[in-house]
Amino acid sequence: MTSSTSVAMTTYPASFASDPLIARVAANLALVRARIATSAAAPERVRVVAVTKTFGLEEVLAAAAVGLGDVGENYVDELESKRARISSTTLRWHYLGALQTNKIARICKCADVIGGVSRVRELERIAACHTEAVIYLQVDFTGANGRNGASPSTIDELAARARSLELNLRGLMCVAAPGEQAAREAFSATTRLADALGLEERSMGMTEDLEIACELGSTEVRVGRALFGPRVSPSTLA
């Protein structure tokens, strides 16, 4: 679900001005789209996922009101709760966090897109749920302990297993280490891997590095603070 609206064409109903949150999200979305427009070769192909983790239902509804069709959560409890309380059939819900095998069945029931997949056993658990969710494999180039994601050397094996299980594998997801050079290296390598595997989606880029990601081939950016402002929790992963 990509947006074809350029920043120059972005207009919203006058009634938005009466809701301060929607007005603020609309203004911030215009800024995000402007950043994409200055860096992506094909800005219309870059999907914006509104990362609503730790935010309330109001932010999810504001994102939908300004035309965003994709929202992302990192915690299964939040994903379940918000999806159950919002009746929209047009929103596409992304699970973006690390996967715990004992929670995969719950995730499969409420996620339309499952990112962060980095192990064969996770793929097998997802397949056992008979879900049609879109799957992204997460790749990590740092090798650091505690970071989610598979080593680049194992991505071929994971992709082959996902396909053998007949999962809806569509792309790769990457969270770059801090710093421009690290981001450039990670995003370039992710694009090369996706191309080699014949995967059309590259979920790369967040609030602080989306320009670099778009320049290097991202088809999806995941932004929270750029749309909604500071989080109420100390997490800064989006």
PLM segments and residue spans:
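Conserved alpha/beta-domain cores
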Residues: 2, 7-201, 206-208, 214-216, ...
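Active-site loop ensemble at the mouth of alpha/beta enzyme cores that anchors a bound cofactor
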Residues: 234-238
